[in-house]
């Protein structure tokens, strides 16, 4: 399973591609790995378009009765200063709910916009979702610029993108916008060109530089108690069960005791191995890792549970929360709701139905309102105060909340 050890001598940053379907997110992902692998052949592998796309597709087709897995592809690459783990988020509207957990893994996002098409509905929705799930830094890649007959078109699209960023609370005027063509960069590398001097690769170097300079070094919560939300579960013959996910805080290494918390009764086990990109690591906050668990069957664990230091987090189902209900113009509900409303609550990698009850004299909560609500979930999940969650209904986000008090 392991192929060497990851030497963490560069700052580690999680990023991902967002944007409308067919604007070139997957092509750009492949282009970045192509350019980076040409510059750092010892440590970075080029990932072909088909490999990125296939990973997204294969992970996306799951039993419809289960919580839908994030249809994403994970790749890694380097700049001169940083090591990046990159997730290629799906752009299709059917998969948009997965961005709630997909984008939550990002320290920053690369918004891909086709210079031919300009801003499209999913461009806006992904920017909105990024804001909601706490992605505070976006770098824009204006793709397919080689196909423009009129260079002024790029100016128009750029202005449009800045407006969208400003509208959703990002600073459009300060956001780096890089123009280029992902496919041209791939072709240049395939033709054996030097990425540091070839004009078609310049846009990718500019993009890496923008990621390095615009997205600040992440503040990791390494010193807190270990917690990782389980994204996926695999069985490895002869080795046991592996759970994967992003470490939210603390660190984990071979031999540590852990608890599996939420959805089912809490189980205690020992982590017998930690890996990232097929290399053995000490997992620290921010890393996407796989943890091998001793004596745990594949069917005894599921996505949405958390792996944590024993005794540090407990399962709960009833809590008070401060929520903001999105206005219609923000993509939310057109009408209000009353007590008994049953939407989906998204906590980390869990989506679970909850019954909302209004507090005090409130008769109805309207779009645009801030309110303190009592929520009871149908299943207990690992929860703590100050934890953020999204409220979803009919395939769209209708509100955001933060747990203010755990009741039971």
Curated annotation (Swiss-Prot):
EC number(s) recorded for this UniProt protein: 3.6.5.3
Gene3D superfamilies: P-loop containing nucleotide triphosphate hydrolases, Translation factors
Domain tr-type G residues, every copy: 10-219
Family annotation (Pfam families): GTP_EFTU, GTP_EFTU_D2, GTP_EFTU_D3
Statement: the UniProt record of this protein carries the keyword Transmembrane: no
Compartments, record wording: Cytoplasm
EC top class, as a word: hydrolase
Main location: cytoplasm
Protein name as annotated: Elongation factor Tu
Gene coding for it: tuf
